[in-house]
Structure formats: structure tokens, C-alpha cells
């Protein structure tokens, strides 16, 4: 199973385990709620998936790497208590609450979330003294004598023995009480995720060409060599940061993230070509429509003579640039929509007041609500940043009214309306620029490569990207719909070829 399917399986499990009847009672029998055990190679995204599931399902997440714990912190500390048995007082040993179980209750107190996921990573790499406690945890959902709170499901993760010498195999008794999901690296699934996350375009196009270099782990007499999904994602961040700082990027830097010399060297060479093609083909200038006809002809002539890899890379660069600009416009659009909703609430609030000075109370209440949401972990970092931006815009509007010495509510609302109108006009200009940019991309591909596989690749990329497909469905793109027939024809042609091959094999 790939990591995307595993994520969906966890989401479905949450829905099943946390289903309630009309009286608010959980319907799934607690004794049948098997913990999920994810077994897969390191760096494939198991921990990241848990964060995504918790955010999408709006439940809590408490994550622990069990190898960082001793038996005392996991099970609890022993304490002597006195009990009366048959009229005789006896000292016995009990245990304090496990640090892990206590952290779940602490999380519930702080956030108000009563349901969630307890995620235990590297569960099959525990020390010998902690191994029995882990088996008890998976079998009975308890640490020591304390149970995992109701409404919390258990997900554990570990690596196969081939990747870690510290791995302890679970016995059949334990495996018969969990839902074991084996996860494999899948380049296509990761590329889909990477496109949404804005991974560097050079990495996306390189792995589209050389999928076999996406993931590998070798343990030889010469040492350990590996390339993981985590490595590619971290490399993307450093590439973007160094490019902004105009710091030179060399093979040594890339080798720090891709710890397989041949792959690091190969990607370093591809990255240099990627940057050169971006400059030679003047991608940004073409999309902006700022290339004079002579330069455009030079770029097209260069593309017509190019190798398959170069043509593929140029197409991927165009797709990356288009996707990035559409994404920027959509974020702006979402910001304006949110601002419109806030201004409607502000207008209702001010109509009941005598002066626009009351706007300060409105802004203060919004900030207080935001602080409460952040404290309760009800917002992701990105959502919190968007809310903070909205509050700052409202504060700026308030300061502008004070600078103009406006205190009348009606006049203040009118001034804010004018400023919002200017924002909307700028948004419409950006929309037209984005639509024009999309048409420019199609025009260049047609002139440079004709209606060949490059155009098909570009069209397929736009269709497969949610941001691009939503933008095109909302605002249109004549060139896209014109070439949709090419995409459909190609799909039908491939289906016919497959049918022919099947018939010949029979």
C-alpha cells in the first residue's frame, strides 16, 4: 500500500471507531478497536501523514517516539500504597500514570479536543526492558494500569528489519490484535503531494524523468547509502532559500540531503541544466509577454532542436511557473473573500455604535478569539497566519480613519468601502494577468513544439493540479479547452493500443 492509501485508511478508521449513536455513545466495540501498525521504510512520510489526518479530521494528535523513553516514563514510577485485605493491612506496589497517557489528558485539557490519535513511532525498536510494556500497550491499549482515554485511537509505526538492526519482531499473538499496514515508496503518489506542497520544480521534473531515483536504501560493507522522501523535501527548502539569498548551490550541498553519491551527482547536473534552461528559454519573460519576436524565435528554434529531456524540462518549467502564479492569485482571492466577510461583520457591529472608535473593540475581540484558537490548537500555523493578516488589515483601516480624523460611523464605513473597492480592482487586474499568462504558455508551446507530446504533458499537468483545474473551470481558458480534444484523443488512442496488445497476446 502506498502512503496516500494508508492515509485514507486511517481517516476511514477514525470515522468508524468514533461513530456515535443518537445518545452520543460510541457504537464501535472498544475491544474490537485494533490499533493500526504502519510498517514502512524510513523517511517515507508516516509521521507527516498523521499530522495531515489530524488536521483534516479536526481531531487531536499526541505523538511520541518511543525510543526516546525509558520504562519508567512509559509505564510510570512505582509507589508503595497500603491496602486492607481481609482485615489485614498490606503494603503493595502501584504505578503512577504513564507520562504518555498523562500527556493525552494534558492535551485534552489544553485544547478541549476529546478525540484524537495517539501516535507511537519506532514502536518495534524499543529496548528489551520496554518491549513487554509495548506488547501490553498494543494488546490491551494500556500503559501500566492506565488505559488510553476513550475517543482516542492508537496508531503505531515502525521500520522493517531490513532498515534497522534494532527492530524486534512481533509475535503472532500481538500481530493478531493489530491492523498491520505495509507501506512502500511510490514516486507518483509523492509527486502528487509534492506538487501541492510547492516542492522545488527541479526536483519535480527530475523525479518525473527518473522515478527510480526517488527512494533507495543500501546497507553495504562500505557503509549506509540512502535517498528518502524526507531528503527530497528538505532539499527543496534549502534550494529555495539559497536561491533567494543568491548562494551558490553545489554537489556537496545536495549530497548532504541525498546520501547516495551517484544520485546526488546526477541531480546536481540536472539542477544546473534546469537553471540554464530557465535562463536560455526566458520562461518568466515569455509568460509576461515581454519577449520581443526575435528572441522568441530564437527560443523556439532552440526548442525544436532540443533533446527529449530538454523539451520535457522546459515544459515542466512552464507548468511550474503557471501553477505558482495561479496559486498566488488564488491565495489573494481567498484573502479578499475573507476580508469581505470580516467587513460585513464590522459594518453590522459599527451600525450599533456612535463612533468608529468602537472599531478598536471589534479588532480586539478578533485578536482575543484568534489567541484562544491558537492556544487550543484549533488552527494550523498557516490558518493562524491568515487570521493574523486579516486582523492587521482591519487595524490598518482603523489607523487610516484616525489619520483622516473620521469619527462618524457612516463616513467611516464609506471610506473603508472605497479602500476595499481598490483592493478588488487590483484583484481583477491580477486575474486578467493570470489568464493572459496561461494563454501565453499555450502559445509558446504550440509555436515551439507544435501539437506534440509536450503540449499533452502540459495539458495533463494542468488537469491533474487542483489549483489549476479550479482556476480554469471558474475563469476559463480558450486554449485549454481547444487542446482538451488532444488529451481525450490521446487517452482513447492509448486504450485502443492496450486492447490491441491484449488481443495479440491472446
Question: How would you describe each model-predicted region?
Answer:
Residues 196-360:
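Alpha-helical lid/collar subdomain of P-loop NTPases
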Residues 98, 149, 171, 200, ...:
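Alpha-helix initiation/capping motif
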Residues 8, 12, 16, 55, ...:
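Charged/polar, solvent-exposed surface patches and flexible loops
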Residues 1-212:
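AAA+ P-loop NTPase catalytic core and its hallmark functional loops
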Residues 300-506:
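Terminal-proximal interaction/regulatory segments of ATP-powered molecular machines
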Amino acid at each position: 500500500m502506498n502512503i496516500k492509501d494508508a492515509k485514507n485508511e486511517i481517516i476511514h478508521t477514525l470515522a468508524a471507531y468514533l461513530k456515535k449513536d443518537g445518545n452520543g455513545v460510541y457504537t464501535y466495540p472498544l475491544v474490537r478497536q485494533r490499533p493500526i501498525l504502519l510498517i514502512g521504510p524510513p523517511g517515507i512520510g508516516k509521521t507527516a501523514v498523521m499530522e495531515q489526518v489530524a488536521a483534516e479530521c479536526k481531531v487531536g494528535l499526541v505523538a511520541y517516539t518511543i525510543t526516546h523513553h525509558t520504562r519508567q516514563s512509559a509505564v510510570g514510577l512505582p509507589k508503595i500504597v497500603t491496602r486492607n485485605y481481609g482485615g489485614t493491612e498490606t503494603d503493595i506496589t502501584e504505578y503512577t500514570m504513564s507520562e504518555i497517557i498523562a500527556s493525552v489528558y494534558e492535551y485534552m485539557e489544553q485544547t478541549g479536543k476529546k478525540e484524537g490519535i495517539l501516535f507511537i513511532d519506532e514502536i518495534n525498536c524499543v529496548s528489551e526492558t520496554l518491549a513487554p510494556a509495548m506488547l501490553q500497550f498494543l494488546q490491551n491499549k494500556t500503559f501500566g494500569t492506565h488505559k488510553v482515554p476513550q475517543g482516542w485511537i492508537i496508531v503505531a509505526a515502525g521500520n522493517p528489519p531490513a532498515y534497522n538492526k534494532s527492530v524486534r519482531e512481533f509475535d503472532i499473538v500481538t500481530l493478531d490484535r493489530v491492523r498491520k499496514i505495509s507501506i512502500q515508496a511510490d514516486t507518483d503518489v509523492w509527486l502528487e503531494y509534492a506538487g501541492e506542497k510547492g516542492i522545488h520544480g527541479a526536483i519535480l521534473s527530475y523525479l518525473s524523468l527518473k522515478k527510480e531515483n526517488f527512494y533507495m536504501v543500501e546497507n553495504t560493507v562500505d557503509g549506509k547509502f540512502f535517498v528518502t522522501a524526507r531528503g527530497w523535501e528538505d532539499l527543496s527548502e534549502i534550494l529555495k532559500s539559497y536561491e533567494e539569498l543568491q548562494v551558490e548551490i553545489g554537489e556537496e550541498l545536495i549530497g548532504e540531503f541525498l546520501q547516495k553519491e551517484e544520485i546526488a551527482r546526477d541531480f546536481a547536473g540536472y539542477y544546473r541544466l534546469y537553471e540554464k534552461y530557465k535562463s536560455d528559454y526566458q520562461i518568466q519573460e515569455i509568460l509576461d509577454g515581454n519577449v520581443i519576436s526575435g528572441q522568441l524565435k530564437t527560443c523556439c528554434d532552440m526548442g525544436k532542436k532540443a533533446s527529449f529531456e530538454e523539451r520535457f524540462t522546459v515544459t515542466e518549467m512552464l507548468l511550474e511557473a503557471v501553477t505558482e502564479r495561479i496559486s498566488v492569485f488564488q491565495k489573494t482571492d481567498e484573502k479578499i473573500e475573507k476580508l469581505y466577510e470580516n467587513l460585513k461583520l464590522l459594518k453590522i457591529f459599527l451600525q450599533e455604535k456612535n463612533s468608529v472608535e468602537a472599531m478598536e473593540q471589534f479588532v480586539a475581540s478578533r485578536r482575543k478569539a484568534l489567541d484562544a484558537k491558537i492556544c487550543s490548537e484549533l488552527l494550523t500555523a498557516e490558518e493562524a497566519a491568515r487570521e493574523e493578516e486579516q486582523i492587521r488589515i482591519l487595524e490598518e483601516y482603523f489607523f487610516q480613519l484616525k489619520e483622516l480624523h473620521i469619527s462618524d460611523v457612516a463616513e467611516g464605513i464609506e471610506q473603508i468601502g472605497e479602500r476595499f473597492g481598490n483592493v478588488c480592482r487590483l484583484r481583477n487586474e491580477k486575474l486578467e494577468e493570470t489568464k493572459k499568462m496561461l494563454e501565453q504558455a499555450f502559445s509558446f508551446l504550440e509555436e515551439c513544439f507544435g501539437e506534440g507530446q509536450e503540449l499533452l504533458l502540459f495539458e495533463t499537468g494542468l488537469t491533474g493540479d487542483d489549483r489549476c483545474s479550479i482556476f480554469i473551470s471558474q475563469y476559463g481558458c480558450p486554449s485549454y479547452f481547444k487542446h482538451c480534444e488532444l488529451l481525450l484523443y490521446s487517452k482513447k488512442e492509448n486504450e485502443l493500443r492496450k486492447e490491441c496488445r491484449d488481443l495479440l497476446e491472446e
